[in-house]
């Protein structure tokens, strides 16, 4: 959609640029799975925009749920142009995961974390629904938790994480 808007010269491309604030959830040394200390047994996990590798799935006991909007555009690219539309798009995705039974969502990109966690209050306002008991983790935070490491970035989440 963003490319189509720019191609049609309906808006200046600079108007769509957004400087993403620093997100500590992606500051992590852990890039791959080590010793498993917490297997997430009985947890339903939603992933947004990527698939968890099969070798990780085989080592933990979590159930990875599928949901309709797992690969849909979350509106980040339109945030500067139309914030309300962006919040509605992101709210539809996170609520789809929530309504599909996920206990939390794992994201692999800082922009996705920003939309789902940092903007969570705006998403709740936009949708008229609460999901304060739902969490969003970066992939690196998730790998850390599997290994029993509580990353300090968990304390900076807008949706407070109290999994372990």
Name what the model sees in each region.
Residues 1-164:
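Iron-sulfur cluster-binding electron-transfer modules in prokaryotic oxidoreductases
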């Amino acid at each position: 959609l963003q490319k189509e808007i720019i191609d049609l010269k309906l808006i200046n491309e600079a108007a769509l640029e957004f400087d993403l604030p620093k997100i500590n959830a992606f500051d992590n040394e852990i890039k791959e799975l080590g010793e498993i200390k917490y297997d997430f047994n009985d947890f339903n996990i939603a992933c947004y925009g990527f698939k968890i590798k099969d070798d990780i799935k085989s080592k933990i006991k979590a159930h990875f749920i599928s949901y309709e909007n797992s690969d849909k555009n979350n509106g980040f690219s339109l945030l500067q142009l139309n914030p309300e539309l962006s919040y509605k798009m992101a709210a539809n995705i996170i609520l789809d995961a929530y309504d599909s039974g996920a206990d939390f969502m794992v994201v692999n990109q800082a922009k996705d974390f920003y939309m789902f966690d940092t903007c969570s209050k705006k998403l709740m306002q936009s949708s008229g629904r609460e999901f304060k008991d739902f969490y969003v983790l970066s992939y690196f935070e998730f790998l850390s938790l599997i290994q029993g490491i509580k990353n300090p970035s968990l304390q900076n989440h807008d949706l407070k994480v109290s999994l372990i």
